């Protein structure tokens, strides 16, 4: 198990964890997120769900997690990222789904949208956002 864990962390280019025997309690927030993602990959999951993975992280740890999310996509894994941080979303997403009051109000290709359009959808919902455009 230790060998597989070491190989998985290496395949994700996670270099900030000194030892797989290191206690999770001693890891930074970014390292903990990396371990959580590696655990999903280790069990051959093809979809990884990340709920606010950069919340409460510092700049360096946020960078580490976003880079990891990009590497997952490059390795062919689907990543579902829940975030309120639009700059994080636009950095790593291919497609953006906007939920408002628990309902899907739109799916946007990142290459065909911008932050303003997403904010309008979040604020007003799809129909209102289209009317105000």
Positions of PLM-derived features:
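Glycine-rich phosphate-binding loops of nucleotide-dependent enzymes
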Residues: 1-133
């Amino acid at each position: 198990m230790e060998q597989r864990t070491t190989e998985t962390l290496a395949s994700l280019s996670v270099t900030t964890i000194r030892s797989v025997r290191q206690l999770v309690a001693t890891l930074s927030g970014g390292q903990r997120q990396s371990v959580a993602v590696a655990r999903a990959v280790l069990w051959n999951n093809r979809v990884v769900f990340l709920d606010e993975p950069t919340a409460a992280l510092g700049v360096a740890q946020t960078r580490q997690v976003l880079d990891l999310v990009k590497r997952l996509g490059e390795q062919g894994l689907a990543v579902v990222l829940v975030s309120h941080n639009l700059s994080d979303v636009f950095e790593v997403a291919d497609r953006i789904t906007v939920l408002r009051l628990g309902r899907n109000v739109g799916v946007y290709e990142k290459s065909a949208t911008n932050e303003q359009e997403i904010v309008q959808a979040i604020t007003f919902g799809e129909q209102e956002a289209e009317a105000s455009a």
